[in-house]
Amino acid sequence: MLFRSDDCGFGYKRQGNVELLERMSKEYDFKLIVIPKLELEGEIVSSTRVRRLLSEGRIEEANRLMEDPFMICGPVVHGNHMGAEVLQMPTANQIPAEDKLLPPKGVYVSRIRYKDEIHYGISNVGVKPTIEGKNPVGVETHLLDFAGDLYGKVVTVEFLTRIREERKFSSIEALKEEMQNNIAYARAWFEKNES
């Protein structure tokens, strides 16, 4: 059984189409099911549309088009320990594969899944410009009301909405103040949307 959209193209220069698949299904004895395009909010739902919305930071719009929220999954790695030691806000750091589609650099409201547990938090996608040093693009997540150890554990971070762009602050104190504002925003967002 083969499922394809009604506008599929495949093969050399995308010359293959539904008509070719229909002929091939008779010749090679398989069932072809053609799925019509789905429209939502006046546009066709497609992976191209989802990628465009994600690359523009329009997380909530992209999530409405998918069965599950946009997420990354991977092990928690050691960072420079600035979150716990300097900011008093421990973070779970992940370094996604270079070819992984990520939303634009910035801070996001996030939901974190680990085993059967669900936690809420804020996630920064980017290079942590306020912290000196050359940092790879990563995802750094502060879990609200969580005191466990996730190093080496595989966690899933779901991006729910964008709070702001990543930016360099004039001081660690200014960064800490902004992180508290981000946490307050996230708590209000969860209270409104998750209750």
Residues covered by each model-derived region:
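Anionic-ligand-binding alpha/beta catalytic cores of soluble enzymes and soluble regulatory domains
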Residues: 38-39, 43-92
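Phosphate/ribose-recognition catalytic cores of enzymes acting on nucleotide-derived substrates
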Residues: 24, 79-195
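Residues at alpha-helix caps and immediate loop-helix transition turns in enzyme cores, especially N-
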Residues: 13-17, 46, 106
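A short, charged helix-loop
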Residues: 25-38, 45
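Short, small-residue-biased leader/transition segments that mark boundaries at the very start
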Residues: 1-2
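Short glycine/serine/threonine/alanine-rich loop segments
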Residues: 30, 68, 110
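Charged helix-capping and loop-helix junction motifs
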Residues: 14-22, 140
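Short histidine/acidic/glycine/proline-rich micro-motifs that form metal-
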Residues: 7-12, 39-41
